[in-house]
Each structure stands twice: as C-alpha cells, then as structure tokens.
C-alpha cells in the first residue's frame, strides 16, 4: 500500500514540476509561430513604428570623467600628474620641473614636430612639458603614439601594419608570412621611401604626414620592395590586393622556379608560363587552378601506361612538409633541390577494350604492336 502511495506521490510531484515548463514552451512556441505567419502582413506597421521612434542624441548621454586627483599632497593638489604642464616653446633639457610641479620626482620632456602625444583625446602642441609620471623611454616616437590615460603613459603603435613590437621598431609590413620566408631573408623585404629615395629608417625622421601618404602623381610614397626568397628559394612579390604584403609563390613547390611562374589573383589561377622556358606545367592537366610542377601526371602512348606524380622526401624537404606516409625520393633525386617528387609508371594501365577484360598482356602488346593492329576503343594511342 505504501509503495503505491509513494509512486503516486512521485507522479504528482513530477507533474507539478514539469507542467509549468510545458505550458511555457507551448505558449512561446505558439506565439512565435503566429508572429512568423503574420510578419509579412505587418511590415507597414513595423516601418511606421521605426519612423516614429526617437533616439537619444549623443550630447544627452552622460559624460564619465575620472577623478585623477588622489589628494596625497598638502592642500589636496597634485600638479603635473593628471595633465602635463606646458613650460616652454623650445627644448630645455636642463629645465627643473621639481620646482614647478612641487615634486622632486617630476621630469621634463619635449614634444617635437613629428611626435604624437595624446592627453584626454587632444594632441599636445610642440614644446616642453613637465609631468610627475614616467614618460616611456623605449618608445620610438617616429612610429608610436604616446597616450596619457589614467595617470600613466602608454606607448602604442601608430600603425601596426607597418611597425610594432618592442618600442614599435619591428617592421611588420612585408613580413607577415615569416614562416614562409627563407631563414635569414626576412630583412630583405624592405619598406622603401620613394620621396627620399632610400629605405625607411625609423631611427630618423621621415618627415611624413602618415604612412599612407601619396605622391603628386597619386602613387604611394612608401612601398614594399620584396627582395626576400620564400622557403623554396623563389623570389617573393607584392600582393596586388595589399601593397603592404609580400607573398611567397604559392603556385609551386619547385625550388628556383622561373620568375614568370606566379598566381593570377584576378582569376584565382596559376600561370605556369611557357613550358619550354619554365620547365613546369599544371599538376592536373587542363586545370589552371592546380599548382605548377616539373613532374606531373601523364600518359605514355608508346607503352600504353599512365604516369603518376608521387611526392617524396629528400634532403631539402622542409620539416613542415615531412610526413611518415611519404616515400624517400629515388637516389638520383634524393639530393636534388628542385621538385621533391618522382614519376611512378604503371605498365599497361591503359585498357584497349571498352570493358578492360579483352586485353593482351602488356608484354605481348609491346612485342606485337608493330605487327598487329589493335582495336583501341578510346583512340588515345592513335
């Protein structure tokens, strides 16, 4: 009797717990279905509501101001901390800021013509300033923006597409694909100043307005010179869609390939050039989107045999292309630094008949083909 009561009690408890969730699900699902079914009919009403809706103007939003006065000095004042104090129009390295700021730890710094110091959203004018906060010393002013925020100075990159890293002196332009550049060659991808006629040196003033500055003819003042070689010893080139990027030759794994072999970005294809000159062609015959290689799949009409490209491992194979599934290259190409692949020929793999059953053996075919006229259904041998 007690067991029956316990079972009934459990069922009642389960009903009490589950039933509200089921009702909520049913109501929400039914309301969503009604909304979806009538959405098209209520488009005019929704547009009218959106037109009548009033938005809060930006000037009506609250302004949050941080109180940077810590009140740690007598008189509840702390000069030169929240905002640097302008003291001179010319550079005075020996200026005593301790007396002006009433703090012996105050330091002097000078903002030059090409420097960018930002305080409370405003750029500091040229001149000398005093501050009680330590100004970043290892911060290249040519490539950086020195930002004052919450009682501290921060050195950030002016344009991280060009220079970033420690002190913002590390060139990133043209070196995005560092893992695809031949070791020791990344420094050859240089940023060139066409106005001054020299490589950009961030240790000196470039007298520029921005890194994207244009010359009078509308061309870019700063351009990439891609003189480095990729990990296949092929010359890198500028990306036509991004003038700040040097690309490796993604259309081939052949070392020292001809310079005319390169991608065609407009069509997404690979241009293998004239085979008589470049010695490479598309890996997949007829497919211009396939890579260019010297060893490709083919068919030998003299022996009625198919040849297949097999990638292998030699002494010049990069570690990122190593695989336990790859074979070692043959002895005649194991120490070669060109194309890490060999051609594997399957003798007699071409069927003469339509069903592949009524076939002579490959040896019989080679011995008798000069005397016997075989019926080639596909006509590839004629």
Swiss-Prot record:
Native species: Orgyia pseudotsugata multicapsid polyhedrosis virus
This protein's name: Uncharacterized 43.4 kDa protein
Organism lineage string: Viruses, Viruses incertae sedis, Naldaviricetes, Lefavirales, Baculoviridae
